[in-house]
Amino acid sequence: AYVSGLGRTRRVVVYDTLLAAAGPGPEEGSGGGADEVVLVVAHELAHVRHRDVLWGIIGAAALAAVSVLAAIALFDLGPVQRALGVSGLGDPLATPGLLLLGAAGSLVAAPAASAISRWAEARADWVSLEVTRDPVTAVAGERRVALENRADLRPNRLLMVMFASHPTTMARIAQASLPAPELTGFR
């Protein structure tokens, strides 16, 4: 499931695979079925409540602007121009150099962007647990998805820091397994 759009175009999309997995479902509160759909929708509505799509767009635009300005500033330095073999921004050969600097800037910014995304996902997980008070379903859902997707339960730490937009399966299970009083960390 995911949230998309802004204002009147805002939507929560639930995949047919989640609905199919819900099926007629086990007993309420047993960790699956319709309870899982409710938990997932609560998670997505937490993203709506906190305007995560809007903040994601603003963050990406700000990061892009900073990256472009940094690339231009770096490109104006003589040593960078000499290293790339160009005479300045007006040089047609400058385009590949600017693209290279942009890619390097994206790699430098990736850990921060990924950490913010993981934080927003963890916050939405907390909200869904606060709303549903159903950690059994949260754990069962994480296990089901991990098995279906053959998730790496111990992902490479560097790859996690650089590129992971969501907490690991094990982190989400650990979060859902905390005692109920701990479920007040995010609002």
Regions found by a protein language model. Give the residues of each.
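Polar-ligand-bearing catalytic/cofactor-coordination segments
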Residues: 1-89, 108-187
